[in-house]
């Protein structure tokens, strides 16, 4: 399936998200489910490894799969790398969802800057550690609406 890249304006997520083209523009190639999943995982891993701020253990260990390795340290590194990539993917998807639901922040640099200012304030509040990126962005959005 052809995809285009949409850059997210979130200071935490420097990178681009793959967004499927509308069905009228592209026709997906039929693949068995397992092949689609493997391809998606490979793309996610490649994208994760290419980040400029990848944790040092991920940068050293380019293999994110947990193959039968003799060294337990390499297994732990592969597992922590997989966790990092999964968290990155979830965070990126949540931010993309928020900006799809609230496109006004994509259209106006001023609105985006106000959102990021409120976003930082929400992050600094006690009890905000357990909030997801989506919940934090939504809280910042609601504060802006209340002003």
UniProtKB/Swiss-Prot annotation:
The keyword Signal applies. Keywords: Cell outer membrane, Lipoprotein, Membrane, Palmitate, Signal, Virulence. It is found in: Cell outer membrane. Residues 1-15 form the signal peptide. Disruption phenotype: Mutant shows decreased levels of InvG/SctC. Deletion of the gene reduces the invasion efficiency of the bacterium to 70-80% as compared to wild-type in vitro. SctG/invH-ssaV double mutant shows reduced secretion of Sip effector proteins (SipA, SipB, SipC and SipD). A lipid is attached at residue 16 (N-palmitoyl cysteine). A lipid is attached at residue 16 (S-diacylglycerol cysteine). GO terms for cellular component: cell outer membrane. It comes from the Bacteria. Its main location: membrane. The keyword Signal applies. Belongs to the InvH family. Involved in the synthesis of the type III secretion system (T3SS), also called injectisome, which is used to inject bacterial effector proteins into eukaryotic host cells. Pilot protein that is required for the proper localization of the secretin InvG/SctC in the outer membrane. Required for the secretion of the Sip virulence factors. This is SPI-1 type 3 secretion system pilotin. It comes from Salmonella typhimurium (strain LT2 / SGSC1412 / ATCC 700720). The lineage of its organism: Bacteria, Pseudomonadati, Pseudomonadota, Gammaproteobacteria, Enterobacterales. The gene is invH.
